[in-house]
Structure formats: structure tokens, C-alpha cells
Design a protein with these regions (language model features):
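Catalytic cores of nucleic-acid endonucleases
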Residues: 7-14, 18, 23-34, 38, ...
Length: 104
């Protein structure tokens, strides 16, 4: 995405959440967005056919700009509060790709 570098951190986060929601919709999920800031969950997704429910924290992928690991994805880990309630991290790349492990 060309404009991605000109976005503020908040705008990048919002873009990633909308992109993740669109991706999940294509996978058959109904999306329920968050309604408050600083929530450990960004989206709740419920599969239309199976009823599988996911609690998701969306992360935009960041790449290391320097150092010996330059070019590597910066690893994100769920907070203790997120681990307690089984929140999954969903990674969103600048090109709009999404994945669960952030390694593609």
C-alpha cells in the first residue's frame, strides 16, 4: 500500500483492523468490532456455519529497519490478560495479506 508510510500509528492500526475484518469475512466469519479503546480484543469473529468463535487482536506487521536482524518481522506476543482469555493474534501486512503466525 503506497500511502501506508504516511499514516499515523492510529491510522495504521485502524487500517489493519478493517483489512483483517474484510479477510475474515471472506473466510465465512461474522465480525463484531470493539467498542472501546485499550481493549485486549480488537475483533470477535463467529463462523457462519460452524459457530467457531475467535477473540482477535490485530497486529500490523513491522519489519526491523536495522541491526543484525534487519528485515526480520518484529515478533508480537499476547499480553497476560489476552492469554487468560485465549485471544489470538492476527497479523496484517502492508500489502493486505493476513495470517495467524505472521511468518508469510
Amino acid at each position: 500500500m503506497v500511502l501506508h508510510s504516511k499514516m499515523s500509528k492510529v491510522m495504521k492500526g485502524q487500517w489493519a483492523e478493517f483489512t483483517a475484518a474484510a479477510w475474515l469475512i471472506t473466510k465465512g466469519y461474522l465480525i463484531y468490532p470493539k467498542h472501546q479503546d485499550n481493549d485486549p480484543i480488537d475483533l470477535v469473529a463467529v463462523h457462519r456455519n460452524t459457530g467457531r468463535t475467535l477473540k482477535i487482536d490485530v497486529k500490523s506487521v513491522s519489519i526491523r529497519a536495522s541491526g543484525r536482524r534487519k528485515g526480520d518481522r518484529i515478533n508480537r506476543v499476547p499480553s497476560d490478560a489476552q492469554k487468560k482469555i485465549c485471544v489470538k493474534l492476527l497479523y496484517v501486512y502492508k500489502d493486505g495479506r493476513c495470517d495467524w503466525n505472521g511468518k508469510n
